[in-house]
């Protein structure tokens, strides 16, 4: 006999959500968003978003197109600064320091918070020079140091075995999936603390997607990862926590398993069961 979730007057679904709230409360916070709004000119795109991104976990942002998930992701390393008329109100604290404070070194911030985009964007250089690009910008040119960085970054991106004999060939000769893993290697070569992935698999075939998903799982032992995805199955597979956004607002944020199986908000349930989106 199926038991009612309100057995003996106890709301079991609420108990489950309380348990996951406790789990989140125990996590070390990498990125704290105490209240963030964002405007493009007069148009408001984000409305008082409040959340804590846990350290060395994978957090996924889901929601329909235009809901603000990529906009929010890009606030974490101030990529929105490059958009004319963009204005942010509020704060984002990276390990306790507000990245929007006056005098923030944005170049250093973007080293600490690396970003991988939807479409693989290798530079028209050799595989080797792609990986060391950020290191050379930092003034690191010692061959031994660069050689070591290339090997560990490519190993870290699960690409070394496929390219170790062609490091001095053009990166443009790689497949789409290999190019995306190369971009991840280039990003981790400068030793960031956070990786932002903006739909990193949307341009890839299923086999390449699986390799990138496996890589994300491996990388979270060293990095805090935030991924935007249109693919709810992908969010369920790779993330520890999921945030559902709708029309610029954070509707629900919590443990991925709980959010997908026992959402607190009807709006979340409607989205994940395909009623809209």
From Swiss-Prot:
One Pfam family, short name: ABC_tran
Keywords: ATP-binding, Cell inner membrane, Cell membrane, Membrane, Nucleotide-binding, Phosphate transport, Translocase, Transport
Lipid bilayer topology: Peripheral membrane protein
Predominant localisation class: membrane
Transmembrane segments: none
GO cellular component: plasma membrane
Positions in coiled-coil regions: none
Amino-acid positions noted as binding ATP in the UniProt annotation, renumbered to this chain: 63-70
Role, per record: Part of the ABC transporter complex PstSACB involved in phosphate import. Responsible for energy coupling to the transport system.
Family: Belongs to the ABC transporter superfamily. Phosphate importer (TC 3.A.1.7) family.
Protein name (database record): Phosphate import ATP-binding protein PstB 2
Gene expressing this chain: pstB2
């Amino acid at each position: 006999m199926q038991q009612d979730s309100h057995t003996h007057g106890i709301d079991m679904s609420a108990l489950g959500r309380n348990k996951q709230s406790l789990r989140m409360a125990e996590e070390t916070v990498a990125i704290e968003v105490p209240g963030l709004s964002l405007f493009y000119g007069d148009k408001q795109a984000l409305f008082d978003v409040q959340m804590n991104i846990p350290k060395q976990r994978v957090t996924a942002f889901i929601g329909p197109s235009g809901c603000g998930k990529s906009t929010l992701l890009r606030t974490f390393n101030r990529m929105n600064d490059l958009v004319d008329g963009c204005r942010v109100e509020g704060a984002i604290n990276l390990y306790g320091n507000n990245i929007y404070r006056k005098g923030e070194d944005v170049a250093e911030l973007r080293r600490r918070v690396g970003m991988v985009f939807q479409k693989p964007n290798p530079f028209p250089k050799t595989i080797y020079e792609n990986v060391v690009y950020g290191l050379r910008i930092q003034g690191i040119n010692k061959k031994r140091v660069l050689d070591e960085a290339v090997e560990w970054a490519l190993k870290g991106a699960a690409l070394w075995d496929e390219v170790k004999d062609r490091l001095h060939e053009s990166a443009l000769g790689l497949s789409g999936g290999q190019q995306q893993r190369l971009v991840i290697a280039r990003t981790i070569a400068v030793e960031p603390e956070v990786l932002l992935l903006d739909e990193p698999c949307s341009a890839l075939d299923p086999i390449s997607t699986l390799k990138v998903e496996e890589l994300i799982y491996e990388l979270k032992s060293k990095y805090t990862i935030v991924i935007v995805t249109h693919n709810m199955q992908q969010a369920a597979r790779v993330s520890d926590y999921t945030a559902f956004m709708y029309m610029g607002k954070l509707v629900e944020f919590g443990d991925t398993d709980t959010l997908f199986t026992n959402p607190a908000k009807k709006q979340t349930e409607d989205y994940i069961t395909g009623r809209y989106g």
